[in-house]
From Swiss-Prot:
It holds the Pfam family Hep_core_N. This virus has been isolated from patient with fulminant hepatitis. A genomic mutation in 1898 creates a stop codon at position 28 of HBeAg, without affecting capsid open reading frame. The HBeAg negative variants of HBV are associated with fulminant hepatitis, but can also be found in patients with persistent infection and chronic hepatitis. One of its GO terms (molecular function) is structural molecule activity. This is Truncated HBeAg protein. It comes from the Viruses. The gene is C.
């Protein structure tokens, strides 16, 4: 769950396509 939270924080900080792809990669 921590990873998911971190992903959300990153998305909020930098809502970009790269961030989304990174989030999907982590998940």
């Amino acid at each position: 769950m921590q990873l998911f939270h971190l992903c959300l924080v990153i998305s909020c900080s930098c809502p970009t396509v790269q961030a989304s792809k990174l989030c999907l990669g982590w998940l």
